[in-house]
Design a protein with these regions (language model features):
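Extended, amphipathic, non-transmembrane alpha-helical segments
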Residues: 69, 99-103, 130-137
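Short, charged, amphipathic alpha-helical segments
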Residues: 87-98, 118-129, 151-162
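N-terminal sensory and localization modules of signal-transduction and trafficking proteins
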Residues: 1-10
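Alpha-helical segments in soluble extracytoplasmic regions
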Residues: 82-110
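Juxtamembrane amphipathic/coiled-coil helical coupling segments that flank
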Residues: 38-53, 71-78, 104-112, 137-201
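Extracytoplasmic/periplasmic helical hairpin
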Residues: 70-93, 115
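Amphipathic alpha-helical segments and their boundaries
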Residues: 17-70, 89-90, 111-131, 183-193
Length: 205
């Protein structure tokens, strides 16, 4: 009878040990899975940060800076009477047009490759259309300036053409704000997952 009791007790201990071992195994697998998923999420968000949101924001900032310089050069052209200075302004404007076109192409490629970035496509297209309209008016402004019709050129720059430029900058600002939110979210997600991995390492240790 005593032997039977001992056998039953041993079986209970073995059962408890097996349950414990299974629990440890399941918990270990769970922690490994959490760490793996977190690592993948970190990698995905780092790619978004380095390949989408950061370069897109950089391009938007460059566009804002270059278009502002473009407008400054137009004003400089209006107030100058020296032919050499006016020619220099025209050359700078042409150079800026080329740089703006290149930066715009880079931004378009980034947006086309990312589904979230494509949500800003409508604002981007409106901004592009506004810029093309403004750029087309630039030729007329410079022509009037060359003909010593500065008053007409200034009226054009501060009137309808300015409204077009303002519409362009407003859409760029909307895009920049949207992309900044996405960048901040990607950084937050990467940081949270990093903390999770740290907790998993501590728990596993």
């Amino acid at each position: 009878m005593e032997k039977i009791k001992k056998c039953i007790a041993n079986l209970k201990v073995e059962g408890k040990l097996k349950v414990y071992q299974m629990t440890v195994l399941v918990m270990t697998l769970f922690l490994v899975l959490v760490a793996l998923i977190s690592t993948l999420v970190i990698r995905s968000n780092i790619e978004k940060i380095t390949e989408v949101w950061s370069p897109a924001l950089e391009d938007l900032q460059e566009l804002e800076t270059m278009t502002a310089k473009y407008r400054i050069k137009q004003y400089q052209h209006l107030v100058e009477s020296d032919d050499a200075v006016m020619t220099s302004c025209e050359e700078e404007i042409q150079k800026l047009e080329s740089q703006i076109q290149d930066t715009d192409a880079k931004l378009e490629a980034i947006m086309s490759a990312n589904s979230k970035a494509q949500k800003g496509q409508d604002d981007y297209e409106v901004a592009n259309a506004a810029w093309e309209k403004y750029r087309a008016a630039s030729d007329e402004i410079l022509k009037l300036s060359r003909e010593n019709k500065q008053q007409e050129a200034a009226k054009l720059m501060t009137g309808e053409v300015y409204e077009v430029y303002k519409a362009f900058t407003e859409k760029l600002t909307i895009l920049r704000d949207e992309f900044q939110v996405e960048l901040d979210q990607a950084k937050t997600m990467a940081n949270v997952c990093t903390i999770i991995i740290f907790v998993v390492i501590v728990a596993a240790g």
